[in-house]
């Protein structure tokens, strides 16, 4: 008799996606990040749901409601810090996941890659709106600075900013709508992640060698479920260590001061995971140019499948391109550092050079390296 998991309509879907899924036998721990991102999303939705039960999206009470969660709600501080540091874990896994895709040529599955880019943008929007909710100084001024970027759009810019604000400044209406979107977007992310998986399972997973793995595949369960559980344990260990021992390591002290529209903080900066994009935005003196560079810093990922000129999929056997990849990694770390520094010499010039290098490596140097390697291998 055939097992119900192979015949039952619902069980069959789960079976084909997580149990009997044919998986390459040689995929490394870099392929764990997808399941870790799923775990992060579940943690964020769960903790966020409990926080929403006690939070009030009103300029008069938002700050004190967060203080109330931390002080008076049973284990409220744990939930709050798990949610705040969970976002850092989420973005760490996201960046590593994208890096893995770049290194091993996973971007050649175009639909999966493009939906992944949309997922990144949606996650960034969600995190930005979430940062506004505690209504501290950095929440208010971060929201003011970033939403003000829309005014760079010709003709409709200023009207668009006021439409987003729901008034003439970031106020109660803005906070309410940001809370609404922050609550809804994670479910949209979950839906997009399902489509991401759907397209991935059409082609199957890539592997470190970049060669076809059709002759040598194994079932996802138990081999990779066990491997994913180990990754999950390590993720939870890191998250709980941050939450319990250093909850404020990655947050801004300014956000413990109630939002005051009459006092501007000396340095307005976003959370660490946005600093690379913020550095690119600040490196261009022109407002519209900066906004375009900011948007392109993420959208540039979508052109990577087109600029792939190598005859090999993966970077495993391509030393010149590997050097370019690690240059890009170092460059992104430099941008992250610059984004947190004040706008003065020498940080301005370092940021400008790093911004140029970021686009140059992705659009020119990596494709050029591929052509050189093709020539050397006489392919």
Curated annotation (Swiss-Prot):
The chain crosses the membrane at residues 33-53, 77-98, 113-133, 178-198, 226-246, 288-308, 320-340, 347-367. Disulfide bonds: none annotated. It is a multi-pass membrane protein. Heme b b566 binds at residues 97, 196. PROSITE patterns: CYTB_CTER, CYTB_NTER. GO terms for molecular function: metal ion binding; ubiquinol-cytochrome-c reductase activity. PANTHER family: CYTOCHROME B. Component of the ubiquinol-cytochrome c reductase complex (complex III or cytochrome b-c1 complex) that is part of the mitochondrial respiratory chain. The b-c1 complex mediates electron transfer from ubiquinol to cytochrome c. Contributes to the generation of a proton gradient across the mitochondrial membrane that is then used for ATP synthesis. Belongs to the cytochrome b family. This is Cytochrome b. Heme 1 (or BL or b562) is low-potential and absorbs at about 562 nm, and heme 2 (or BH or b566) is high-potential and absorbs at about 566 nm. The cytochrome bc1 complex contains 11 subunits: 3 respiratory subunits (MT-CYB, CYC1 and UQCRFS1), 2 core proteins (UQCRC1 and UQCRC2) and 6 low-molecular weight proteins (UQCRH/QCR6, UQCRB/QCR7, UQCRQ/QCR8, UQCR10/QCR9, UQCR11/QCR10 and a cleavage product of UQCRFS1). This cytochrome bc1 complex then forms a dimer. It is found in: Mitochondrion inner membrane. Binds 2 heme b groups non-covalently. One of its GO terms (cellular component) is respiratory chain complex III. Heme b b562 binds at residues 83, 182. GO terms for biological process: mitochondrial electron transport, ubiquinol to cytochrome c. A ubiquinone binds at residue 201. Its main location: mitochondrion. Keywords: Electron transport, Heme, Iron, Membrane, Metal-binding, Mitochondrion, Mitochondrion inner membrane, Respiratory chain, Transmembrane, Transmembrane helix, Transport, Ubiquinone. Its cofactor is heme b. The keyword Heme applies.
